[in-house]
Amino acid sequence: MEILLLAVALSMDCVALSMSNGAKCANYGIFRITKVSFVYGFFQGAMPIIGFFLGALFVGFIEQIDHFVAFAILGFLGVKMIFDSRENSDEITANLGLKELISGAVATSIDALAVGVTFSFTSLNIWFSCAIIAFVCFILSFAATFIGKKLGEIFKDKALILGGLILIFIGFKILITHLGIL
């Protein structure tokens, strides 16, 4: 039960990003929604494994900069999405590039890397735990992308602006939480 709750918690940033991506890419069909969800699920599942094996070596360095990296990436993607809303005001048919997709996946899974470090101090099975995390993230991201797609079809450029603001907010929340302000 603990791992399921952890998986849901780790997936929340991906859910928000997926909803924003769905709004941005209202032309996406099931295949592309599945692809986006798979990438987010993969990174959420892989990062704890990386943290588990390499975390002890780099945990001090990662903890010092992870919030700045996440803030910069999510802030950039959010601002870009807001600017894109001005260009695509009639119809939202943007495509999410691989670089943008992976940047978002990395930014939203940095916390999973830190969780992986803590796994080395528990009796949890790392492989099973990470499979659960990846699967839960995939399912939640799939649903969120689909919901975002529908909202994007209804609200058009307003959905992009809201999605961009959500990404900026998530990045800001990560930053102020890690700095101890919140």
Swiss-Prot record:
Superkingdom of the source? Answer: Bacteria
- Protein's UniProt keywords contain Ion transport: yes
Could you tell me the membrane topology recorded for this protein?
Answer: Multi-pass membrane protein
Any one GO CC term of this protein is: plasma membrane
An annotated Gene Ontology molecular function = manganese ion transmembrane transporter activity
Q: What Pfam family is a match, any one?
A: Mntp
Say where the protein is mainly found: membrane
Q: Which InterPro entries match?
A: Mntp/YtaF, Put_MntP
Q: Write out the annotated subcellular location.
A: Cell inner membrane
Keywords recorded for this protein, A-Z: Cell inner membrane, Cell membrane, Ion transport, Manganese, Membrane, Transmembrane, Transmembrane helix, Transport
TM region positions: 3-23, 42-62, 65-85, 126-146, 161-181
- Give the UniProt family note: Belongs to the MntP (TC 9.B.29) family.
Q: What is the annotated role of this protein in its UniProt record?
A: Probably functions as a manganese efflux pump.
Q: Which protein are we looking at?
A: Putative manganese efflux pump MntP
Protein's organism: Campylobacter hominis (strain ATCC BAA-381 / DSM 21671 / CCUG 45161 / LMG 19568 / NCTC 13146 / CH001A)
